[in-house]
């Protein structure tokens, strides 16, 4: 039919920009199974371009030329630091090079980095994509700084990563918190309910943006499409912290991703579920954002010596996800669901999932997140976390007061899942305690009295933590991971929060953010009357 029907042949040849062979390939492979939809046309066209990895290819060409380096870095392809070569390998160290014309420059990309960013934008369905080498922390901060100026209001949930509040300290914007509902059993914050977002928007019509977590660390998703629609109706931008959502762009039957929901900007941790090297990330922008201005904001804080190891890993990982991501994340979801069922069969644990969805505070759930409630066996999540590492050589992502999180991704195997399940069964058998002895604690939403910037730079004094109730905090206090502040600058310290911090320390949570490494003292504002209205 394609060869004989001139009209049909003309249509598909035009659709594939004159590439007759590609058109024939599409007709033969796709139509019998999927139909000739515009979406399938786009998929096969993108698959062709997505096979490229411009930064990686440029590095390979450079290596073939055997260039003699009289530039930095000073290890000179590893020759000046043999121990580094022994640790990382000759090829890795030889590709740790500086910016040069054939390799482009991240601060002002015009060739291979520009091409790689364009391919990333295409793969993630964004208008523009930026390679970020300072982690998603720098991506989130650049996103907020691009939108907010001193005195601007931004609507956001309190359970944001510390990078968001750090950005408010830098730019002087004012947080308007939509405090999500807290699950009293699990002790975690849930998603932003659309009614609460609407209330915050109506009460703060001058706010410039709404920021959303998609998903949270624990897999909870808000109704992102409705939030975007509501914010845009009130001429506000929508920023999405998608640090834990790379896979949402490629997997099937997963929660909606930021760009598909119509969000204006999204920070995506490629190194978490996307397979790139630690510290590599993406910042995505939509059509409503001036990406040239965003580029200027990024360059205020981004290094001028960007790592080509990180950038090439972003390039290669994007290619891998674009070509094989759908199948990869189907397997990831299957492994996570299998693990969830097996862990729940042990008894005592609660591996939560889609059963939490209620259409409101839990609008959707990311099934790739293996979040497990542990207090049912009388152990805090951090205690199970430590036992798995110290006694079973299993390193999981997170342990808090009530939960653990095992991160399942494209590098996991079913035998690894079996080992984790077996270890959890063993932990219950050997180490379980009476749950009645557990302190009943949950995440507490603090009251903001002073803007983060004003509090951070205010005159402060150091006090023993047990004596700080009623004072205004002048620094961050958090468990890491997840890096969500228990207290941030400008928030009221209460007896309940003090109890939470002390209990988390006693259970072994890794505390950080305070000037005092032991977290025995807190910096508080000297002038308690300095209340921001």
Predicted regions and their residues:
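Active-site phosphate-binding strand-loop segment of PLP-dependent enzymes
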Residues: 186-247
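PLP-dependent aminotransferase-like
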Residues: 151-212
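Conserved N-terminal alpha-helix of the aminotransferase class I/II PLP-enzyme fold
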Residues: 93-138
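N-terminal "arm"/small-domain region of PLP-dependent enzymes with the aminotransferase-like
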Residues: 21, 41-111
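Conserved beta-loop-alpha segment that forms the PLP phosphate-binding cup at the N-terminus of a helix
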Residues: 128-153, 167
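Conserved C-terminal alpha-helix-loop-beta "cap" of PLP-dependent enzymes
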Residues: 338-513
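Structural signature of PLP-dependent enzymes
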Residues: 317-340, 416
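Active-site PLP attachment segment
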Residues: 257-296, 302-313
